[in-house]
Regions:
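A short, conserved alpha-helix within the catalytic core of class I
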Residues: 389-403, 426
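Short loop/turn elements that flank and shape the SAM/SAH-binding pocket of Class I
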Residues: 367-371
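Conserved class I S-adenosyl-L-methionine
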Residues: 306-317
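Short alpha-helix immediately C-terminal to the canonical SAM-binding loop
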Residues: 344-345
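Second-shell loop/turn segments in exported
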Residues: 281-285, 388-391, 416-422
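Soluble small-group transferase modules, centered on the S-adenosyl donor enzyme superfamily
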Residues: 220-278, 284-288, 298-302, 442-512
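Alpha-helical transmembrane segments of multi-pass membrane proteins
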Residues: 2-248, 259, 263, 273-276, ...
Length: 512
């Protein structure tokens, strides 16, 4: 018997399924890309505008300080765009974009503490000081945030055939963000929020947006996220708790009230670091600042005794002189043209201002509001809208002076409180401009607390009548210039016109 053979059959082996590949990086959707550059560019412009107000208490608000801030921020934007593009080509642009957004927010949160720390030392040191504080406080955040646009573009550019469309779209959204940031800050945020609060909100928004974007793109590790959150909390608290020098942060000023030493019921109104007004809450006849005493004496000369006066005040401040006029010349009517609504509200809430027929605030730019004043309606016009750092140039020109003449009665008085130092080029220019409109122009250089008349408040008096001024004894010590001396003093002064009024360059600041 033949034994049968069993043929072994091959055993089939099934291979185990291959592990799934790790998920690839999450693509940056065009809408997210557009929103990111919109936010970053808008934040830069918002911080730039807010920096002007944030720095004003320390370096003033002039054309030159504003130019320094704008120029420094533009340099930061250019630097950030250039360096950001280089790093976007050399590193993971997703992680870079997230890091830049978080870092930009953290640097924005540092803006207020840096300004509060460096600002006091910059006061009185001119435009280089303004530039230095800006470089330290604002340029880092502007540069970091400006590096985001080229990084986003690097992420979006996958098809060179569509590169023009992509770059154009991102540029459009970045510009739109800048526009929204600009208009939103000027028209909404500054009137609504204190400047320091607005900067805090911007910084928190940027940093939180960076964290959310990092989670969405899976581009931030747990340790980095925890560190970012700690930074947000720490810097947010630092920014929020840093003392503000302002009792009221208005659209135009950092306003502060101080008790006047030696007076039970008197306050100083301090605007952007300058002592603007002395207000006695119980006795409006008490006017302590020498320049107000000089102007009051000039008004008394025009309206002797207690004769009522129809007056237009250009600039309200603490409303010291309008209230003095109502108390010393019963029946007087004062229109007070004040651009700063919040300052008027501060006067009403904290300084006892009660608007009435005798003292009527008119909120708006005086150059516009003056057009509503009837011709030949005012005995006096008082120009008191100038400080050592803030010069509304449109209220110094020949065209403005023509408007003042229209409002004045024949023989009426136009008195200006101007501040100048050094060579007095600004005072000479304004006197020369007044002499083109009025027959009798005189100058009073008011002494400072130490009796020095080499700079500070200067009272310019202009009228068509051959007026001889009489002054109270407590206003003595000033340098007075009669008509002939004033003409010699201002003989080479620049005529200020609407199309040529370089007042910021003519003004000389102490220690500037």
């Amino acid at each position: 018997m033949t034994a049968s053979r069993t043929r072994s059959q091959p055993v089939s082996k099934r291979s185990a399924p291959a592990p799934a590949p790790p998920p690839g990086p999450v693509a940056l959707a065009p809408a997210v890309a557009a929103a990111t550059v919109f936010l970053a560019s808008g934040a830069v412009l918002m911080l730039e505008i807010l920096a002007v107000r944030l720095l004003a208490p320390y370096v003033g608000l002039t054309l030159e300080t504003t130019t320094s801030i704008i120029g420094a921020v533009l340099a930061g934007i250019a630097l950030g765009a250039a360096v950001g593009g280089v790093f976007a080509d050399r590193t993971d642009p997703r992680k870079l974009m997230v890091g830049l957004l978080i870092a930009g927010g953290l640097l924005a949160l540092l803006t207020v503490p840096i300004v509060r720390a460096l600002g006091p030392g910059a006061r009185g040191h001119g435009n280089l000081a303004a530039l230095g504080v800006t470089l330290a406080s604002l340029v880092p955040s502007a540069a970091v945030l400006s590096a985001i646009s080229p990084t986003v573009a690097r992420l979006q550019l996958r098809d060179l055939g569509a590169s023009g469309t992509i770059v154009g779209r991102l540029s459009a959204f970045a510009t739109a963000g800048a526009l929204v940031g600009t208009f939103g800050t000027g028209f909404v945020i500054v009137p609504l929020l204190p400047v320091s609060t607005a900067v805090l909100v911007i910084g928190l928004t940027l940093a939180v947006a960076g964290l959310l974007l990092g989670g969405y793109l899976q581009a931030i590790g747990r340790a980095a996220a925890v560190a970012a959150i700690a930074g947000i909390i720490g810097l947010g608290l630092l920014s929020a708790t840093r003392d503000s020098p302002c009792d009221a942060d208005t659209s135009y000023h950092c306003a502060r009230l101080e008790r006047a030493p030696g007076f039970a019921d008197a306050r100083f109104l301090v605007l952007d670091g300058d002592y603007n007004s002395f207000v006695d809450l119980k006795n409006p006849k008490d006017i302590q600042f020498p320049y107000t005493q000089w102007i009051a004496s000039a008004i008394d000369t025009v309206a002797p005794g207690a004769r009522p006066v129809d007056a237009v005040f250009v600039g309200g401040g603490g409303f010291t002189l309008p209230r003095w006029l109502a108390a010393t010349h019963p029946g007087s009517r004062s229109q007070v043209l004040e651009v700063d609504k919040k300052l008027v509200e501060l006067d009403e809430d904290r300084l006892g201002l009660k608007p009435s027929a005798s003292v009527k605030p008119v909120v708006g730019d005086a150059r516009v509001s003056m057009r509503d004043e009837p011709s030949g309606s005012a005995d006096v016009v008082i120009g008191d809208a100038f400080s050592g750092f803030t010069i509304p140039w449109q209220l110094l020109t020949r065209e403005w002076t023509t408007e003042v003449r229209r409002v004045l009665k024949p023989g009426g008085l136009y008195a200006i409180n101007l501040i100048d130092f050094g060579k007095f080029d600004l005072a000479r220019a304004e006197l020369a401009t007044l002499r083109r409109q009025f027959a009798n122009v005189q100058l009073i250089a008011v002494p400072d607390a130490g009796g020095d008349v080499s700079g500070g408040n200067m009272i310019l008096l202009a009228t068509d009548r051959p007026q001889q001024w009489s002054y109270e004894p407590d206003t003595s010590g000033a340098a007075t210039y009669d008509r002939a001396a004033t003409a010699r003093f201002s003989a080479h002064g620049t005529l200020l016109r609407d199309d040529f009024a370089p007042v910021d360059q003519l003004l000389t600041l102490p220690h500037g």
